[in-house]
A protein has these predicted regions:
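Glycine-rich phosphate-binding loop of ATP-dependent small-molecule kinases
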Residues: 1-318
Length: 318
């Protein structure tokens, strides 16, 4: 990482319901003097894959209603048909990062004219990059015909329009004095051995990030046990069903719950400890990409109990 006053990128990662969003809110509450001590700039600009996961589920609901089938998730297990969609999500937020770097918050007119096509195309392009998928929406159109596909798109229009609007609202006119915050969670099946098999875990997903991101990122990992994560997830899902703190926004609310079988099958463990044990540099995550090894600077462990405010530790810029 180049010597500089502020971290260009801070990644928040942990198991679900571990306090990433609460910690992000805490960062936003800090004064400039306080954030300077952590080598952070202003942190309101974010990159988060949760809105895309949420949109996948809503698109699937529309597809099942209109077309009689789903695109991303198995209706019975509620898990991905193909777990390589974890890679799809990384490629989506790679694109978001570079759109942010352009510092142009004006939405291109062609996207405004058809926000559904814009989002469906983004999913297809990102998925194809993993090497594991065809162009799914293109194939849906061929399978069901123009009229039925048009009805499906109409069902998805409002959702896609909101995602488009919020994506560009998140793009600043300048990155001067800012730290871009990434938020995402990765894991693997309960009881899995290490290394986790692709596409599970941080080892797989981090290696898909663009080199520029890996070269400029530090990671703040919030450490909780899977059991703590399960319990907090159940609590916030219940609060969500009761209508507490809900929002029409596609952005992350504190009350989105992950299905319990998904918690067990995809977040029953993670590979952060395993990766740290492989690193020749203590406290760094070693990530291999395209024949190079990147060491993500510096793990700041926030070991916390669910419900308590996380305390950030000061780290050294290198």
């Amino acid at each position: 990482m180049q010597a500089q006053k502020h971290l260009p990128i801070l990644m928040f990662s942990s198991l679900p319901a571990s306090g990433k969003s609460e910690s992000r809110r805490y960062l936003k509450s800090l004064t400039k003097e306080q954030t300077d001590k952590f080598h952070l700039g202003e942190t309101s600009t974010q990159v988060d894959d949760y809105p895309y996961v949420d949109a996948m589920r809503k698109i699937d609901a529309a597809a099942e209603k209109v077309l009689g089938e789903t695109v991303f998730f198995d209706p019975k297990s509620t898990m991905f048909f193909n777990s390589y969609d974890w890679g799809t999500l990384v490629y989506m937020i790679n694109d978001d990062y570079f759109d942010i770097k352009r510092c142009d918050p004006k939405i291109p007119e062609r996207f405004c004219q058809d926000p559904v096509e814009w989002l469906f195309n983004r999913y297809d392009v990102a998925a194809v990059k993993t090497g594991q998928f065809p162009s799914r929406f293109f194939n849906l159109k061929l399978k069901h015909g123009e009229a039925k596909y048009k009805e499906f798109k109409k069902e998805c229009h409002d959702l896609c329009a909101i995602i488009l609007k919020e994506k560009y609202e998140n793009i600043p006119k300048s990155l001067e004095g800012k730290t871009i915050v990434f938020e995402f969670a990765r894991g693997g099946p309960e009881g899995a051995s290490f290394p986790l098999k692709p596409p599970f875990g941080y080892e797989y997903s981090l290696a898909l990030f663009d080199k520029e991101i890996l070269e400029n990122a530090a990671i703040l990992y919030i450490w909780v046990t899977p059991e703590m994560s399960y319990n907090k997830n159940l609590q916030r899902a219940k609060e969500g069903q009761e209508g507490k703190s809900q929002t029409v926004s596609t952005q992350l609310s504190l009350n989105h719950g992950v299905p319990h079988n998904v918690m067990k099958g995809e977040y029953g463990t993670d590979d952060i400890d395993y990766l740290l044990g492989l690193s020749p540099k203590k406290g760094y995550l070693p990530i291999k990409k395209d024949g190079e090894e990147f060491h993500i600077n510096r793990i700041s462990e926030s070991r916390k109990r669910i419900g308590q405010r996380s305390r950030l530790k000061k780290w050294k810029m290198e």
